[in-house]
Amino acid sequence: MDVEEDDLCLLTSLLEENEAVLPCSSEKDKSLSLGDGDPDEFDELFDADGDGESYTEEAGSGEEGKTGNQEERLATLFGDVEDLTDDEVATSKVGNSGPPPAPSQEKTSEELQDELKKLQEQMKSLQEQLKAASIKQPPGTAPLQEPPDSSLQPLLKEKRIRRIQESACFSAELDVPTLPKAKRVARKPKTPAESSSRMRTPAQPLQVSSSFLEPNHSSSSRSSTPSPQAVPGNKCSRTIRNQNTVSPGNSGDRPQQVSQVSVEAFSGLRLRRPRVSSTEMSRKMAGRKLIRLPQIKEKMATENLEETDWVTFGVILRKVTPQSATSGQTFSIWKLNDLHDLTQCVSLFLFGDVHKDLWKTEQGTVIGLLNANPMKPKDGLKEVCLSIDHPQKVLIMGEAMDLGACKAKKKNGEPCTQTVNLHDCEYCQYHIQAQYKKLSAKRTDLQSTFSGGRIPKKFRKGTSLKERLCQDGFYYGGVSSESFAASRAAAIAPKKKVQTTLTNLVVRGTNSIIQETKQKLGIPQKSLSCSEEFRELMALPTFGARNLQKHLARAKASGSSKPAIQSISASALLKQQKQQMLEMRKRRSEDIQKRFLQSSSEVQSPAVPSSSRQAAAQSPRTGAEFPRLEGTATPRMPKLGRGISEGDDVLFFDDSPPPRPKLSAAAEAKKLAAIAKLRAKGQILTKVDPNNTVRKQMDGRAMLGVKERVENSNTVSPEEELEPARKKRREQLAYLESEEFQKILKAKSKHTDILKEAEAELQKSYFEPLVKKEQMEEKMRATREVKCRVVTCRTCTYTHFKPLETCVSEQHNLHWHDGVKRFFKCPCGNRTISLDKLPNKHCRNCGLYKWERDGMLKEKTGPKIGGETLLPRGEEHAKFLNSLK
C-alpha cells in the first residue's frame, strides 16, 4: 500500500510540473495527430478491448453510462501505454541496426506529453467518481503496477464495496476527506464475524441504554468501551462467540459448549449471549453497592437508598401487557427475580421514554438497575415495586441460561408453569417431594431398566377386582391371605360321612389292591380283542412281528409257571441269592476245568516224560489263564481285569504269588523240544527253587558293567541338566522383548472409540439419576418454607390445610387465604410442620420446646464413630439428670 501511495504522489507531482507545458504541446500533438493519416495497429486492438462488454452485465442499470465511459478511458489509457512499450522495443531494434532518427525521438516525447495530459484528466475523473461513491482506497495506482488484463479490477472492487453500504456509521466513516497513513494500515479485509458484529452495533439496545453512566460520558464511553471479543479475560463472552459461530451440522456439540459457560460475577447467573464483558462490568460496578433482589425490602426499611449509589440484577420472568395510566401515557410492568429465591419477586414499572425504548425487551433477559426508585404497592400487597426514570439506568446483560419451567405435571394432567432454576433442579418446590419419592422407590442399579411392576394386560390370567387388588396376596395380623383362605375353606367344607362295613375292617388282598389301582389308572379290566389289521401285521414275516411273538410267548410261560406276587422274608431272600451265586461259581469252575483238560490232552508231545504229563494233567490254580486258539481274536479287556479270563472269580485278598504266564500249545511244544535237545547234548538244567529268597550273587564282569553304567549316568552335572530349561527360559524372555510381541501387546482394536462411547453412555445412564436425586436433596434441604393455600375457621379459631367435616356440615365461617408452611426439628430428631412462625405444641418425643428451622428433607446422618457413641458414665437415668447441671 505504501508503494502505491508513493507512486501516486510521484505521478501527481509530475502532472503539476507539466501543466505549463501541456497547452503548447497539445497544439503540436493535434497537428501531429492530424498529420499522421495511418492509425496504429495497437490503438485499434485496445480500442476494441475497451468496450467493456464482458463487465456490463454486473453493473447496475443506472450506472451503465458512467461505467462505459470509465472503461473506455481506462482502455485508451492502457492502450497508449502499450504503444509506448512497443515503440521502445521498435527503437531498440532500430538502434541495433543504426542510430535512431530525430523525428522518431521527438514523436516519442510528444506522445509522452499527450499521455500525461490524458492521465491527468483521467485521474481527476476517477477522483470525482470515488468521492461520489464514498470509497476509501483510490484505485488509480493499480494500472501502474498490474498488467493490462487486470485493468478493470477497480470496477469490481467498487461494486463489491457498494453492496456493504447499509449502515449510516459505515458511510459516515467513508465520507472522511483525508485520512492519515496510520489509518490506512487498518484497512484490511475483515472477517464475516467482525463485519456482521459491526453492522449490528447500532441496532443493539445496549448502546441505547449504556450501563450505569452519566449522560455526558455516554458518548465517550461508547466509543472507548472495548468489545467483548477484545477483552482477554472475558471467558464467558468468548465462549458464547464460539458457540454462535457453530455450523448447523455441529448442533450436537452444543451442550458441551454450554457447560463451559462461566457464571457472571455480579448477578451470579449464567448468560447465553452476554453483551457486556467482565472487565467492563467491574469498571462500571466500581464504587457502587450491590444489593440482591430479596434484600431490597429489608434495605428499604433500614437504610436510605436515595443517598447511596446501589445496583441490583434480575431476570425478567413475566411481562404484563402494557396499560394506560389516567394521564393517557402507556406504561408496562416487569416481574423480576434473581433465580436464587423464587418465592420473592420484584415489580418494575416503566413509564414514558423508558417504556418507549425498552418495551421490546424479551422475557428471560438479565438486566441491571441503577438507583431504582421505590414505589408504594397496592393495598394488601407486600410486593416490592420499583421504577426507573431514565433508559440509561437499565443495563441489558444477556439471556438467562438457567431459566425454565417445572417438568412435572399437575393433578389435572396439565404441565406445571412454576419457574425453576434449571442449574439447581428441574422441579418446583411443590412437585419435588413427589418426584423424589418416585425416584427413591426404584433401585439405583435399575434406574434406566425395567424393575418389576405389573404384568401386561394381555398376559394376565384374570382381570377381576380381587385379582387386581390382591395379586401377590397380603398379610394381616401375621397371617398371609393364602394360608387364611385355605384354613377357612377347610373349615367351611362339609365333612363326608363314612359308613363302617366289614370290608373296611378286613385287610384286603393283593388282587383287590391291583383291581383298585387299575380302576384309578383307567386301565380296562377285560382284554381287548385284536383287530384284523393287527393280526395281518403280526402274520407278516418281519423281524418286528417275530420279536413281538417271542416276547408274548415268554410272558405267557413266565406268567403260568410263577405266581404274580411272592411273599418272602429278607433273610430267606439273602440265603436264596447266596445259594444261587455258589451254584453259578461251581458250574463255571467245572466248565473251565473240562475245557482245559480237553485242550491239553489234544496237544501232547510223545517226547514228553511221564512226570511232565502228570504235571500237565493236574488241575489248574484258581484264576489261571487258560490257553486259547491262535486263530480266535481276543477282545480288548480293561487294565483292571488284565490277566483274568471271562467268567473267572476275582479274589481281592489272595496273598499267593501270581501264576506264571501259560504258553500256547505250539510254544509249549517248542519249549519241550528244546529241553530234549539240551539233554541229548548232556547239559543238565538245574531247577530253580521257588522257596529260595536269597539272590544269586552276580559275576565280576556283570558288576563292572553295572558300575560303568552308573558312573556314566552320574557324569552329567546338575548345571547341564538345568541348561535346557534355562535355554528355554531365555528364548521365552527374548520373545517377550521382541518387536513382534511388543507390537502384539500395543495392538488395539479399531472399535475402541465405539467401546468408549458405549461405556460413557452406560456411565451417563447410571449417574444421571443419581445426580438428579442429589440435586433434589439439596433443593429440599434448602427449602425451609413453602407457600400454600390454607383455610381458617373463625368459628372454631383454627387454621389448617382443609376444614373439618363438622365445620363444613355446620356451615361455619370459613376463610380461605394464602399461608406459609414451615418446617421445624427438635434436637431429639423429631420433626413437625407449622403454619405459624413457631409450633404451638411441645415435642411429642422428648416433651421439650426447642424447635429449630429445618428443610423440607430430613438430613441424613451417617454411621457414628466410637467417640460419639461412648458413654463414660453409662446410660443416664431420669433421677440422676440433676447431676449434669
Swiss-Prot record:
Region span, N-terminal domain: 1-153
Coiled-coil intervals, chain numbering: 101-139
SMART domains, sorted: Mcm10 (SM01280)
Region ranges (Disordered): 23-260, 579-642
Location of the region described as Zinc finger-like 1 in the Swiss-Prot/TrEMBL record: 406-431
Single GO cellular component term: nucleolus
Subcellular location field: Nucleus
Numbered residues of crosslink Glycyl lysine isopeptide (Lys-Gly) (interchain with G-Cter in SUMO2): 639, 772-773
Ranges annotated as biased composition (Polar residues): 193-217, 236-260
Principal localisation: nucleus
Spans traversing the lipid bilayer: none
Ranges for region OB-fold domain: 251-405
Zinc finger-like 2: annotated segments: 793-812
Cited InterPro entries: Mcm10, MCM10_OB, NA-bd_OB-fold, Rep_factor_Mcm10_C, Znf_Mcm10/DnaG, Znf_Mcm10_C
Chain positions found as Phosphoserine: 656
Modification Phosphothreonine, positions: 85
Composition skew (Basic and acidic residues), residue ranges: 63-74, 107-121
Pfam families reported for this sequence: Mcm10, MCM10_OB, zf-CCCH_Mcm10, zf-primase
Gene Ontology MF annotations: double-stranded DNA binding; enzyme binding; identical protein binding; single-stranded DNA binding; zinc ion binding
Keywords: Coiled coil, DNA damage, DNA replication, DNA-binding, Isopeptide bond, Metal-binding, Nucleus, Phosphoprotein, Ubl conjugation, Zinc, Zinc-finger
Biased composition (Acidic residues): 37-56, 80-89
Basic residues: compositionally biased ranges: 181-190
Function text: Acts as a replication initiation factor that brings together the MCM2-7 helicase and the DNA polymerase alpha/primase complex in order to initiate DNA replication. Additionally, plays a role in preventing DNA damage during replication. Key effector of the RBBP6 and ZBTB38-mediated regulation of DNA-replication and common fragile sites stability; acts as a direct target of transcriptional repression by ZBTB38.
Family: Belongs to the MCM10 family.
Assembly and interaction partners: Self-associates. Interacts with ORC2. May interact with MCM2 and MCM6. Interacts with the DNA polymerase alpha subunit POLA1. Interacts with RECQL4; this interaction regulates RECQL4 unwinding activity. Interacts with WDHD1.
Name of the protein: Protein MCM10 homolog
Gene behind this protein: Mcm10
